[in-house]
Design a protein with these regions (language model features):
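Periplasmic polypeptide-binding modules associated with outer-membrane biogenesis and secretion
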Residues: 3-109, 139, 179, 331-333, ...
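Predominantly the C-terminal beta-signal and adjacent terminal strand-loop region
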Residues: 347, 384, 470-504
Length: 504
């Protein structure tokens, strides 16, 4: 049986004050770091309960979720009371550093255009003495853009942004009882973001707000529910030259759609499973492991139903609008699988496969640009630059706009080997592409068709070098094109037969 009382076990602890809350004695030094209710709500056993190891582990897990705490230690001391053996329980908590400031500086190279970005963030891990985590981050970026035609006012790209969030270590929802909230071990997050982008072609601002929940199940499964996410995209200025060249011609409905003011109101759910849970030490997986990720997102359905019910008149483009601003409507789903196969201490294989699809309907004919897929780059098919591959067999037309799609397939296999010190080598093969759901005249070959999509899978190969510094991994990859779906002739379709560094 467990009981709570003061004992000589506290003689080694530096304390000078105490308080009683709901029958629990709480000892501390100078100032109580967390509210008493926070402490008692995270206990999974009470005085008088029979000892249960599962309750102890759940208590460790509950306190481990609190970012305001660094260490948790639960001690039991046997005490004889008459003919019974009792356990005196002491939960000892060590606070973490609750305030921190961090800086980040990065250099960018987008197809030869050099730039720089910097950010500063502040974090408070105990804002209201309940282990609430508050974060605010400021970011700025600058890039010189080359290859512009005449008619643009400048040749640089400037971006400013600020984001802030507050994370509560418990489930918050109105009209829900305290007992129910205590049983659901979820965190609640509220966030705000604002972004300002000034390019030669346009000036765009984006503002968003979100409300989400996250919780962990059996240490291996993570759930996230985005209850609501509201984003507003506003373009106060678009270059006349840009309108003339790309928008007013009416050749590409995607461009027209994405350079209009837009409202996105969406909700979603994501599921993540990792077979090793929290047993990863120094970025080294102790045994074979795998992970599964699933994500689902929908937008505009509630607003569309209300618009229909209220018999609201559509605008000139055939869209329902809120205060004159049309809203997006779509469904988006993603599935991702990754597996690590350890051969021995020095060698392993890593496999990854993913698929994603986004379908516009109802109030929209196109997916918002921010929700579309792109291919190429360090986290995709590494033989192509970011947003340089696809859609389908489309080779690109050299304009300023990135190519994107509604469907994405990705797969890779990588052999990794420890070289020396903290360096690791890698050999990889990547495959994948993106496609559009609808056919567009200025993107020939970009639409997805079952009888030919497999012929449009791009393949790349290459070598990589990893510097594993435990707290982060520095990665260098060099990829070459092996199969290029943009060309049909044998020599250009299979560049692996005739490799050329300047081309591939």
């Amino acid at each position: 049986c467990i009981r709570d009382r003061q004992s000589s076990a506290l003689s080694s602890v530096d304390i000078n004050d105490s308080v009683h809350y709901k029958g629990y004695p709480i000892y501390y030094k100078d100032k109580l770091y967390l509210r008493p209710k926070v402490l008692t709500d995270n206990l999974r056993f009470a005085s008088g309960d029979l000892f249960n190891e599962r309750d102890v582990q759940q208590t460790y897990s509950s306190f481990g979720r609190l970012s305001a705490l660094k260490y948790t230690n639960i001690r039991f001391i046997e005490t004889q009371v008459g003919d019974s053996t009792m356990l005196d329980c002491y939960v000892m908590l060590t606070k973490s550093k609750h305030k921190s400031v961090s800086f980040e500086v990065e250099g960018t190279n987008s197809a030869g255009d050099l730039g720089a970005a910097a950010s500063v963030s502040f974090q408070n891990r105990n804002l209201f003495r309940g282990s609430e985590t508050f974060m605010i981050k400021f970011r700025g970026a600058y890039e010189v853009i080359s290859g512009l035609q005449a008619g643009y006012s400048n040749n640089n790209y400037t971006e400013y942004g600020v984001e802030t969030s507050i994370n509560f270590p418990n489930f918050l929802f109105p009209f829900i009882s305290s007992d129910f909230k205590r049983k659901i071990r979820a965190t609640t997050e509220f966030g705000l973001q604002y972004n300002y982008q000034l390019r030669p072609e346009f000036l765009r601002t984006m503002a968003s707000a979100n409300w989400s929940y996250k919780w962990t199940q059996r240490q291996k499964i993570q759930h996230r529910i985005d209850l609501i996410n509201i984003a507003f995209l506003y373009l106060p200025r678009i270059s006349e030259r840009f309108k003339e060249d790309y928008i007013n011609k009416g050749q590409n409905h995607i461009f027209q759609y994405n350079y209009q003011d837009r409202l996105i109101i969406n909700m979603g759910y994501s599921y993540n499973y990792n077979s090793v849970g929290g047993s990863i030490i120094n970025n080294t997986i102790a045994s074979n492991s795998y992970s599964i990720r699933f994500n689902f997102e929908s937008a505009g359905n509630v607003m569309y139903a209300l618009s229909k019910a209220a018999n609201i008149r559509k605008n000139s483009n055939g869209e329902y609008a809120i205060l004159g601003i049309p809203y997006a409507q779509y469904l988006k789903g993603e599935f991702d699988f990754a597996k690590n196969i350890r051969i021995d201490y020095r060698n392993s294989f890593a496999f990854h496969a993913g698929v994603g699809i986004a379908v516009p309907y109802g109030n929209a004919k196109t997916i918002p640009f921010e929700k579309q897929y792109f291919s190429g780059g360090a986290n995709s098919v590494r033989g192509w630059s970011v947003r340089d591959l696809g859609p389908g067999s489309f080779a690109g037309n050299g304009n300023l706009l990135d190519q994107s799609g509604d469907i994405k397939l990705d797969a890779s296999i990588e052999y990794r080997s420890k070289l020396f010190w903290k360096f690791q080598g890698a050999v990889f093969i990547d495959a994948g592409n993106i496609w559009t759901i609808r056919s567009y005249a200025n993107q020939p070959g970009g639409v997805f068709k079952f009888d030919r999509f497999y012929k449009q899978i791009a393949v790349a190969y290459g070598l990589g070098l990893r510097l594993d510094l435990d707290f982060f991994i520095l990665r260098f990859d060099g990829g070459m094109k092996a199969v290029n779906p943009a060309y049909e002739t044998r020599k250009e379709h299979f560049p692996i037969i005739h490799p050329k560094f300047s081309r591939d």
